[in-house]
Amino acid sequence: MTDIVIATYGFGGTKDNSATEKFAERLIAKYKHFGVVVFDWPAHGADSLNRFLPDECMRYFDLTVHYVLEGMHAENLYAYGTSLGGYITLRYLTEYGNPFRKIALRCPAINIYDIMVADITPEEQTKLDRGREIVRGYTRKVRLTSEFFNQLRASDVRKKEYFDFADDMLILQGTKDEFIPFDEVRQFAEDNVIDLIPVENADHPFSDPGIMDLAISKIIDFFHPEQ
């Protein structure tokens, strides 16, 4: 394999998810020289850590980039980031540089701080203020501290510029995303001159199989356009 895609997922999920599996199957079936690498975020899936911090996500992402380039000897590296994965990918570009040939983001969580603080109860805020943890998550419960929220607040990707990467980027955003407002993503894309594909009637996870198939096709065509 000469071309490798690093695929990342959203908060509270796991690398063993059907969306990534379907993407990998279709990509590899069509282009034999492609491969897909996935990994678990800190305190997600099979990872051994208990606490979750965005800066640790950055470290995991960077370790994976170096492993793919140096250990797997990939000639071309691509990024496919979903939700939290999209946020971390955007941070990586401005904080570490761009090792990717092309970058596709599906419903990137550009407003992740706003999302995460929106449902904090007064009781939970008291816990955080006292240095204690609160719990969030789906398939696995994740422990969050005030440091988690502080790191998100300090690294707002909406305040960064992505002009240098825009020619090689694509964003797919659902018009009915219940967490990430479509208009906010559209404004982000316009401000940074990034190509945006509005996906009509798509919710945050792209739960409609037909809509997910369309999104996967668009991303594969972006990574490997037909000659």
Map each language-model feature to its residues.
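Short beta-to-alpha linker loops that shape the active-site pocket of alpha/beta-hydrolase fold enzymes
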Residues: 11, 40-45, 109, 202-203
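Active-site signature of alpha/beta-hydrolase-fold catalytic machinery across serine-
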Residues: 91-95
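Short beta-strand immediately N-terminal to the catalytic nucleophile in serine-hydrolase-like folds
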Residues: 79-81, 106
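Short, surface-exposed "cap/lid" segments of acyl-processing enzymes
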Residues: 2-41
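The alpha/beta-hydrolase serine catalytic core
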Residues: 52, 99-198, 203-226
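Gly/Ala-rich beta-loop-alpha elbow adjacent to hydrolase catalytic centers
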Residues: 81-85, 89
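Catalytic nucleophile-loop/oxyanion-hole region of alpha/beta-hydrolase
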Residues: 42-74
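Short, surface-exposed alpha-helical segments at coil->helix boundaries
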Residues: 17, 21, 55-58, 182-186
